[in-house]
A protein has these predicted regions:
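Beta1/beta-strand and adjacent pyrophosphate-binding region of the FAD-binding site
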Residues: 1-13, 35
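Glycine-rich loop(s) and the adjacent beta-strand/alpha-helix scaffold that form part
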Residues: 163-215, 228-229
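Conserved N-terminal glycine-rich FAD pyrophosphate-binding loop of Rossmann-like flavoproteins
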Residues: 39-71
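Glycine-rich FAD pyrophosphate-binding loop
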Residues: 6, 22-52
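Short beta-strand to alpha-helix junction loop
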Residues: 77-87, 104-124, 173-177, 205-208, ...
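A conserved short coil-to-beta-strand element within the FAD-binding core of flavoproteins
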Residues: 135-148
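Short hydrophobic core segments
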Residues: 6-8, 37, 139, 158-175, ...
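Residue-level recognition of phosphate/Mg2+-coordinating polar/acidic sites
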Residues: 23, 42, 63-65, 73, ...
Length: 463
């Protein structure tokens, strides 16, 4: 089979690349075929689950603000960003009949909050431009031959083409088809692959999962994934107490080898995986990379980031006096009164885990052989509110990581065209590249803009 341009991978970046190539060929009056080879039964499976199915498809920030959320390859992305900025991405979808809405944090969604609308728009745009989408087309190998390429399929078929765009994504959510195939092909063609690791993933605190987690890690002592904790691993009693709690506007600081490396304020979720949410995800990139490199990592959560330790200490003491003097507290034990106090300082469902992890808030005084007195340490409560430490035992792997960090080195790719510096006619776009960003629409924007630039230049270079 022959096709002038073959796009391998029918995800967000691949579909945008195919549309960009085909539509530019139509505008130029060139008769050429663009074909997408997608290994799964349907295209854009990962897009379908983005944002829990709501699909935050871009972030409408201008470059200066947007770029601060790109964690790798920021200078590389700039040209593609200006070629297809977020405003153009929004316009593309609206032109395809999908109404959009922009929410807090400049995050753009389909007004329906259905990811299927995003997928339908991409697929319909491709079909309208004459793109051929072949599903269940599993590529085995990409060969550079003469002035073109030979793309070999698992079923024995092959495509001969002038240009190839590799848009196979990374390793995240492999059930959607992202299994790292593009890394092997790129490497075989001479490209350097920056070591990969999961990013925007759950960090698993020590004691959050069952004790068998430690045994599992020991059995993987020689493996690259020895700190990977499968999300399905059962929760411990502590994990059960924390799971499902969502914290709004807390402080979170990341320490590596006892050195502060990052700090921010925002929302944190405790899930069946561990510590997630927008802020937890943002910290995960540096955390996972450090863990993989053998460093000790811990997080410190500040439940009261708006006040100083001195201020919260005085607040705790004042509240305790109110609780202690309340007639309804007269017959209550100290621990019961402490629970009432904590309920004035944090969500009620957080109290059991907070107490379990901060036993120092109770001081037991032995007055005689038979008499003891329990004291509530108010200073310790205040300190724990400001410094709640979570030692990180591991992380959830690619099976539920939002993106893959690492990939095809951007040193081997021309930023203004997305073409390989090593193999003429070969292009890369999307997550297969060593480019990743924060959660909030940044990664899909990068997928779209790098895909659009790759498709445009692949079409332009056709003779």
């Amino acid at each position: 089979m022959k096709s002038d341009i073959v796009v391998i991978g029918g995800g967000a970046s691949g579909l945008m690349a195919a549309y960009s190539a085909a539509s530019s060929l139509v505008k130029a009056g060139k008769a050429a075929q663009v074909t997408v080879l997608e290994k799964m039964p349907r295209p854009a499976r990962k897009v379908m689950i983005t944002g829990k199915g709501r699909c935050n498809f871009t972030n409408v920030k201008e470059w200066n603000d947007f770029s601060s959320h790109v964690r790798s390859g920021v200078s590389f992305v700039k040209s593609s960003f200006y070629n297809l900025p977020p405003s153009a991405v929004v316009r593309f979808f609206e032109d395809m009949g999908m109404k959009t809405v922009v929410e807090r944090g400049d995050r753009a969604f389909p007004v329906s909050y259905h990811a299927s609308d995003v997928v339908d728009a991409l697929v319909n745009a491709c079909h309208g431009a004459g793109v051929k989408i072949e599903c269940e087309a599993v590529v085995e190998e990409v060969k550079s031959i003469g002035n073109g390429f030979e793309v070999l399929l698992q079923d024995g078929g092959k495509y001969l083409c002038s240009k190839v765009i590799i848009a196979t994504g990374g390793l995240s959510y492999p059930t959607t088809g992202s299994t790292g195939d593009g890394f092997a092909w790129a490497s075989a063609l001479g490209h350097h692959i920056v070591p990969t690791f999961p990013s925007l993933t759950a960090l698993v605190p020590k004691g959050y999962k069952i004790k068998e987690t430690e045994d599992i890690r020991q059995s993987r002592a020689d493996a690259d994934d020895r700190f990977h904790v499968d999300r399905s691993t059962p929760l411990s009693e502590l994990g059960e107490k924390l799971c499902g709690i969502q914290m709004k506007n807390v402080g979170l600081s990341l320490y590596v080898q006892d050195n502060l490396v990052d700090t921010d304020q925002g929302d944190v979720d405790f899930t069946d995986g561990g510590i997630e949410g927008p802020l937890g995800f943002r910290m995960s990139r540096k955390a996972v990379k450090s863990i993989v490199n053998g460093s000790k990592v811990f997080l410190v959560m500040d439940l009261k980031p708006g006040v100083t330790l001195t201020e919260i200490t005085e607040r705790v003491k004042t509240l305790w006096k109110e609780v202690d003097k309340d007639p309804r507290s007269a017959r209550l034990r100290e621990k019961e009164k402490c629970r009432i106090l904590l309920g004035k300082l944090m969500p009620w469902d957080l109290i059991p885990a907070f107490v379990e992890m901060h036993r120092e808030i109770y001081t037991l005084e032995r007055r005689s052989r038979t008499e003891t007195k329990l004291w509530i340490n108010l200073v310790s409560i205040a300190k724990a509110l400001k410094v709640w430490r979570f030692d990180i035992a591991g992380y959830v792997g690619y099976e539920r990581a939002v993106v893959t960090a690492g990939g095809v080195s951007t040193d081997d790719v021309v930023a203004k065209t997305m073409e390989s510096r090593l193999v003429s006619g070969l292009y890369f776009c999307g997550e297969v590249l060593d480019v990743d960003s924060d959660t909030g629409g940044y990664n899909l924007q990068t997928a779209f803009c790098t895909g659009a630039l790759a498709g445009l230049n692949a079409a332009k270079s056709l003779k």
